[in-house]
Amino acid sequence: MRKWCPPFGSAFKLNFDVAVFSNTPSSSFGAIIRNGMGEVMTGLSARGPYVASSEEGEVLACRKALEFAIDAGFREIVLEGDNATVIKSLMSPRVNRSRLGHIYEDICTLTTSFRSLTVGCVKRGANVVAHSLARFATQLDFEIIWLEDSPPPAFEALYLDCVSLHD
């Protein structure tokens, strides 16, 4: 999928992403939850730990996004990220025995908190809002949460998503 598409029915869409830069020792996470009309329900920008790989950053961002959705009270979620390796691992029925297996196990446990959870992999173009929030978090020393308000760091990306919904 090249552009953001709304979820069906009563579900909410949760997009997540990580930003990792070679000049900084840490990662940063972004997550956005929107309804079927594309309206922002809540968004998150947060600093993360040092990561050794993009997969590690993405799987940590996924876990953070799911914790965020649970804490905000969402129970019907379409979860989307743009790292195919992470999404394939999440969808696999096999136990992940890699060095990141314990994080995948945490995610598996978190998924039991949802009445409905669908997981999908999207192209970067469909995940721009979450990526914008992850990039913004590199400037933060703390976590920022926006409730029912469009996060300023993602205004442009949200606008472009809205325009593409009506094309």
Give the role of each language-model region:
Residues 1-167:
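Primary recognition of RNase H-like, Mg2+-dependent phosphodiesterase/nuclease domains
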